Amino acid sequence: MSDQFDAKAFLKTVTSQPGVYRMYDAGGTVIYVGKAKDLKKRLSSYFRSNLASRKTEALVAQIQQIDVTVTHTETEALLLEHNYIKLYQPRYNVLLRDDKSYPFIFLSGDTHPRLAMHRGAKHAKGEYFGPFPNGYAVRETLALLQKIFPIRQCENSVYRNRSRPCLQYQIGRCLGPCVEGLVSEEEYAQQVEYVRLFLSGKDDQVLTQLISRMETASQNLEFEEAARIRDQIQAVRRVTEKQFVSNTGDDLDVIGVAFDAGMACVHVLFIRQGKVLGSRSYFPKVPGSTELSEVVETFVGQFYLQGSQMRTLPGEILLDFNLSDKTLLADSLSELAGRKINVQTKPRGDRARYLKLARTNAATALTSKLSQQSTVHQRLTALASVLKLPEVKRMECFDISHTMGEQTVASCVVFDANGPLRAEYRRYNITGITPGDDYAAMHQVLRRRYGKAIDDSKIPDVILIDGGKGQLAQAKNVFAELDVSWDKNHPLLLGVAKGADRKAGLETLFFEPEGEGFSLPPDSPALHVIQHIRDESHDHAIGGHRKKRAKVKNTSSLETIEGIGPKRRQMLLKYMGGLQGLRNASVEEIAKVPGISQGLAEKIFWSLKH
């Protein structure tokens, strides 16, 4: 053993709690990482007079330093040990063995990979994660993985001979790849990749991918899928929060913030003695047009300085946002605690990772909250209540797009009880109006849309007119003039005007072209569905306008000249070196192009000049 390492003094300081230890050599390199149910007992075994293994003797002889990280449970220690092994690749974790072989978690290389415990030589094709201290730890980890990432754990002999899924599928512990049609190849491969990343200690990547998939599902109104992924995210978060332990014994609160659709989420991680004890998401009420800095500053003040809360203050608070009164807040908290409290906004190292975790959790919690509140059914029910309608089954929204009055396109998007009905979206090319006259454009599109027979099931309950009072007046005039067989009085015409700064959440709604409008709170589900359909209509109109503009741009001036087909056009451009050369050519020069007569050359010349 190294003369510089005092084992006796060290062991006096070691706890009997579970945890992970890292052994360093004289060069500061981690040479071994271990896990123990009782750290004191396990570490004492290394410094007995009669060591059973020469390899253990070789390890102990090189120890210069030992760092210990206490965990809540053995499982927590197991996960942390695995992360450290993957991080440091200690050479004695590869060479050193106890009397029995170490078990591994095995991810097979089959078409539908399976998870299993493995001991002995690694002959089978696949990936091995470990080693783990004992079989119980592997089985416990496999059970945990099965709950979060339900990939198969059955033997191949069972898997190949199944015609219907087993009980594991019925209780949600397996995706059932043994039966065709139960799970797509892509989804199963994705879950396998999550397992691979998770066992490699890349928990953040797993969370990032899951959050992205949840947001996509939510945006596509696939709420059951979004809820399933949300539950998976929460399960991963529960594990990652337990396993993340800091080297520095941090005693701090970490506050991450997310803001969207008029709603804010403040997520607080409570870290004591370097361990994440827990976390909680708060959803403060946010008035419209409130700056994010004000949300953070107000929340922090209320959270810590209200006497009734009686919160235990940490030594340090990490914030996701710069505060103008950071020094004042720190001084106030220090006075309250009777000791120095640091408020930090630009952390580095592990602290930055803590803040990233808090920020991710805030975004995840906010997305979940919005998903719960923003189902189409809930939004339409809220809208019906605001508009004093019995129900809203179908909505249509119109928008106009043009560039300086040119290539005007109107869009109509349709929502039903399940959200966007994209198969019924329509674009209308507007012609015969004064360029830039949006009122005339709205008048034309509404007459074309509603001045004909409509099936009763296609009559909208609400028609949204993007543009405010003027456009709403046009809509009212059109419906007053309609001579149709269907009930033209059934749809409620609603004007939507953007706020002064054209910011989401500041919209004004109008029932009539005259008089004052009204606004909804920025976190109102009714407002969210209005914003959603309006944004869809706007994007649809702009998309159509861009296509029309691109078509005009890509259409050669030669295409409008009678007698010039594709072959002659190609010959002219090739002979003249492009359209610009053709524009600069004389009639005589154009007439020299094969296939171009004198008369046609004159027509081309004057068409390009005028």
Curated annotation (Swiss-Prot):
Q: Which gene encodes it?
A: uvrC
What is the similarity comment for this entry? Belongs to the UvrC family.
Domain (UVR): residue spans on this chain: 204-239
**Domain spans labelled GIY-YIG:** 16-94
Q: Which CDD domains match?
A: GIY-YIG_UvrC_Cho
Pfam name, any one? HHH_5
Q: Which cysteines are joined by disulfide bonds?
A: none
What is the documented function of this protein? The UvrABC repair system catalyzes the recognition and processing of DNA lesions. UvrC both incises the 5' and 3' sides of the lesion. The N-terminal half is responsible for the 3' incision and the C-terminal half is responsible for the 5' incision.
Q: Per its UniProt record, what InterPro entries does this chain match?
A: GIY-YIG_endonuc (IPR000305), GIY-YIG_endonuc_sf (IPR035901), GIY-YIG_UvrC_Cho (IPR047296), Hlx-hairpin-Hlx_DNA-bd_motif (IPR003583), RuvA_2-like (IPR010994), UVR_dom (IPR001943), UVR_dom_sf (IPR036876), UvrABC_protein_C (IPR050066)
Per the record, what is one GO cellular component? Answer: excinuclease repair complex
**Assembly information from the UniProt record:** Interacts with UvrB in an incision complex.
Which terms are listed as keywords in the entry?
A: Cytoplasm, DNA damage, DNA excision, DNA repair, Excision nuclease, SOS response
Q: Please give the start and end residues of each transmembrane region.
A: none
Q: Which Gene3D superfamilies match?
A: 5' to 3' exonuclease, C-terminal subdomain, GIY-YIG endonuclease, UVR domain, UvrC, RNAse H endonuclease domain
- What domain of life does the native source organism fall in? Bacteria
What does the record list as GO biological process? Answer: nucleotide-excision repair; SOS response
State the name under which the record lists this protein: UvrABC system protein C
Q: Which terms does the record give in the GO molecular function aspect? A: DNA binding; excinuclease ABC activity
